[in-house]
Amino acid sequence: MSSLTSVELNFLVFRYLQESGFTHAAFTLGYEAGINKSNIDGNMVPPGALIKFVQKGLQYMEMEANLSNSEVDIDEDFSFFQPLDLISKDVKELQDMLREKKRKERDMEKERDRSKENDKGVEREHEGDRNRAKEKDRHEKQKEREREREKLEREKEREREKIEREKEREREKMEREIFEREKDRLKLEKEREIEREREREKIEREKSHEKQLGDADREMVIDQTDKEIAGDGSTGAEPMDIVMTPTSQTSHIPNSDVRILEGHTSEVCACAWSPSASLLASGSGDATARIWSIPEGSFKAVHTGRNINALILKHAKGKSNEKSKDVTTLDWNGEGTLLATGSCDGQARIWTLNGELISTLSKHKGPIFSLKWNKKGDYLLTGSVDRTAVVWDVKAEEWKQQFEFHSGPTLDVDWRNNVSFATSSTDSMIYLCKIGETRPAKTFTGHQGEVNCVKWDPTGSLLASCSDDSTAKIWNIKQSTFVHDLREHTKEIYTIRWSPTGPGTNNPNKQLTLASASFDSTVKLWDAELGKMLCSFNGHREPVYSLAFSPNGEYIASGSLDKSIHIWSIKEGKIVKTYTGNGGIFEVCWNKEGNKIAACFADNSVCVLDFRM
């Protein structure tokens, strides 16, 4: 018979402490016992292994005590012991207890027999039983009448709630109608203003026709020179290490090209443009998300005195600013018909374009940090502080599978295709998971700090990651080690983005690149194939929290805690537009046309910038 080694026992106790939430005790035992040096595969040890092991031992002692007792008939009922007796006594003491118990049972049986023989009131007892049965029947009928009354009360309450819901729907319908009327009115005003602007521009064009012709000639010469230098799109030239800094010709975005969206009462943590309409979603620490209807075209064509209306998606029934319901992340589905939000209460919510809450998804036991729709739109993926990722079946409004691989909070998730995805965590690990599989399809190890962000390239063959260890890495699904280790940053890298160029994009003939934003105040651009830095954009003075490529891949927008948004020309390697607000910037994003940029600020505002070059 094989025996349990001390190393195996230590590991079982270590796992028990972890599963029971005794984190510090588990850490101490793991350190002193050298758990991390053992060869035991933790994935092969099922949850609750120590408890099952101890229970089996107790059952064995119980069977030994019963079967080894010669005074006990094995055909009789099996006798059970209290767990404390099994732990504190040996087999002989248990057998003595069993014999004593049997003797008492025999004595009690004899006493019952004598009682039956001497009992002369058997008939009276039968009469008492009948009376008790009648009383019980009467009591049951009384309870049935009470249940009927409670059922009627519940039905009345449901009817009252139904009426209240109908009233609430009517109020919401009226608010939506007002919102639509206001939107139509703004659209009409915008069209009129655009027409007037066109007339003015026509006059200006006629006045400066000669000057424009001269400018056009010069632009053609410059463009031709650029093409000759670049080899007209040739890929034969070696990439160069270029460090770019802002120039004195930086163009500050005028106030006429800016709209400040006010309404949130706490810092705005996330924003995202709809992929199908001119709608902007924002999520805030005030326990609300908002859907803003942004006018199309230039802001100059829209009356400056008009506010931009928003639908308010309340995550708390009472007052806002409930910190447990901070909206930390949000994402539109591919069709732009549904918005998903994740919050600090551990719940994901799904909303319609009209601001109607259609699903509340509850499974996590901690705040949700990341949330993504798959391309098909049938699954929603969430990552939480509770160290798990959950795939939700949106149509069924229920969780399909929970993935519990990480030993620390899950910081980011990203779909590779409709059924597989990557997760990253504070435990420095990256896992490739697949729906229906109970173990990771692949494990990527190499980072020495928290992995803040993971992103798949447009083809789903390369995975980029960034970490507090000041590195970004590029991984290939065909191997477990990283393909490129990008080490030019000097501080933590907070986020990364793939360019919308190369295979699998709308710009297939352009080079695929990776951009990274760091606490060292820089944005760096990398050659994805060679793993070499192409250029470093040095213009911010504080950590850079967010960056986004324009849809055509020609520009990068970056947002920093220095309150500034810089828009960089990748071709020229310099800032071409900039805007400074009143708070640190947590996220920036482009609309699908590439003519507007949104940013969310720590001063409770959302900013939308017109961008035209």
UniProtKB/Swiss-Prot annotation:
Region described as Disordered: 101-174, 193-214
Pfam families linked: LisH, WD40
PROSITE patterns, alphabetized: LISH, WD_REPEATS_1, WD_REPEATS_2, WD_REPEATS_REGION
Subcellular location field: Nucleus
WD repeats by residue range: 263-302, 322-362, 363-402, 405-443, 446-485, 488-536, 539-580, 582-613
Recorded GO CC terms: Cul4-RING E3 ubiquitin ligase complex; nucleus
Domain of life, source organism: Eukaryota
UniProt GO BP: response to cold
Entry keyword Repressor: yes
GO molecular function: double-stranded DNA binding; transcription corepressor activity
Protein name per Swiss-Prot or TrEMBL: WD40 repeat-containing protein HOS15
InterPro entries named in the record: Ebi-like, G-protein_beta_WD-40_rep, LisH, WD40/YVTN_repeat-like_dom_sf, WD40_repeat_CS, WD40_repeat_dom_sf, WD40_rpt
Known role: Acts as a repressor of cold stress-regulated gene expression. Interacts specifically with and promotes deacetylation of histone H4. Plays a role in gene regulation for plant acclimation and tolerance to cold stress.
Consequence of gene disruption: No visible phenotype under normal growth conditions, but mutant seedlings are hypersensitive to freezing.
Keywords (A to Z) from UniProt: Nucleus, Repeat, Repressor, Stress response, Transcription, Transcription regulation, WD repeat
CDD domains assigned: WD40
Domain (LisH): residue spans on this chain: 5-37
